[in-house]
Amino acid sequence: MRFDSVTFDLDGTMLDTVADLAEACRLMLEDVGAPPRSLAEIHSFVGKGMAVLVERCLTREHPPTAEQMHAAIESFKHHYTETNGRFAQIYPGVLEGLKAWKASGVKMGVVTNKPGMFTEALLERMGMSDYFDVIVSGDTTANKKPHPEPILHACEIFGVRPDRNLHIGD
């Protein structure tokens, strides 16, 4: 079957960004006076967006208050702006795959739960931004993945029927 477009998840699919996230979480937890988390814990918290990551890092016996969440999210944003892409690794075979898809003429996009302020900067820092025609971040649509809205939005921008799009993600 031939597809007219292909969309890719970012974290955990094309890039291993856990070390970036872990460093930002470490610094955020330090800022707010919370106990540290292990890399394995942070890895298990990733995938539902920044606010969920921060909340999971803060939650021990009781969930954080709204004030604690606000302070922690602001701290995380500050630190992640600095660590975003610093330790990230492109998974083996990803660049070769992107080159092949691009050469085939298929429209390509990124659909991620990562906030837009971090998505584009990360793609630039990793030298990957030129491969993509569309970027749908976690704050582009009202709903995040796994809701279909972000992928449907990418298809709409492409001008492609959803059944003609292939999504690759973890």
Model-derived regions, located:
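A metal-dependent, Asp-based hydrolase signature
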Residues: 48-82, 92-95, 100
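An amphipathic alpha-helix signature
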Residues: 22, 26, 39, 43, ...
